[in-house]
Regions:
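Rossmann-like S-adenosyl-L-methionine
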Residues: 1-191
Length: 191
C-alpha cells in the first residue's frame, strides 16, 4: 500500500473502504499502459493518490491540482513511496494545460463537484488520447461533461457507481471513455 500524508485543506476521500474500491476500479480501467515510455496526466490530482497508483504502470505521471498544500503533500507522498516518476504542478488545469510541454498517452480526471471547466474540456479532448478515466462525485456535472466527450468522438466503455456515503444521495462514478475507432462506425454504400 501507499503511505499518504494529507493536510487539513487538501481533499481526500473520507470513506477509506469505498475509496479503495474507487481507486482499484480506476487502476483496473487503466490496465497495462504498454510501456515505461507512457505519460499519464492526473488532472485535479489532490494529494496525488491516483497518480501514485498509476506510477508503476507509467513512465511519467503529471498531476495538476489548484490547491498548493495538496501539491506539496503529493510531492512528499511520492517521495515517501519511492516514486520518482511523478511530477505535481500547482495551478488551475485550464491554465496549466497550456504550459505543459509533455503530451499524455492517457488522462485521468477527478474534478470537483462542478465538473470540468467548460474551457478546459476542448483542451483535454484535443490531446486525442485513446482512453480517459473520469471520476465524478456529482452525476449532473458528469452527464454534462460526458455529453461533450461523446459529441467529440469518445464513447463510454464502462462505468461503475461507488457508494461513498451510504444512505445519502451522493455517489462517486468511475467512467472509462475510449476514442471511437473506425470500426465503431457503419458505412452505407448507396448504389
Amino acid at each position: 500500500g501507499l503511505k499518504l500524508k494529507i493536510s487539513t485543506v487538501s481533499f481526500f476521500q473520507t470513506n477509506s473502504y469505498s475509496a479503495e474500491v474507487l481507486y482499484r476500479t480506476a487502476r483496473d480501467y487503466v490496465g497495462d499502459l504498454g510501456g515505461s515510455d507512457k505519460t499519464v496526466f492526473d488532472l485535479y490530482s489532490g494529494t496525488g493518490t491516483i497518480a501514485q497508483l498509476m506510477a508503476p504502470a507509467a513512465g511519467k505521471v503529471i498531476g495538476v491540482e489548484i490547491v498548493e498544500e495538496a501539491v506539496e503533500a503529493a510531492k512528499k507522498n511520492a517521495a515517501a513511496n519511492g516514486l520518482d516518476n511523478c511530477e505535481f504542478i500547482a495551478g488551475d488545469v485550464l491554465k496549466v494545460l497550456d504550459e505543459v510541454e509533455e503530451k499524455p498517452d492517457m488522462i485521468i480526471l477527478d474534478p470537483p463537484r462542478d465538473g470540468i471547466h467548460p474551457k478546459a474540456l476542448p483542451k483535454i479532448i484535443a490531446y486525442g488520447v485513446d482512453h480517459i478515466v473520469y471520476i465524478s462525485c456529482k452525476p449532473t456535472s458528469l452527464v454534462r461533461d460526458l455529453e461533450v466527450f461523446l459529441e467529440n468522438g469518445y464513447r463510454v466503455d464502462k462505468a461503475v457507481a461507488v457508494d461513498q456515503f451510504p444512505w445519502t444521495a451522493n455517489v462517486e462514478t468511475v467512467v472509462l471513455l475510449s476514442w471511437k475507432s473506425v470500426d465503431d462506425f457503419m458505412y452505407v454504400d448507396y448504389a
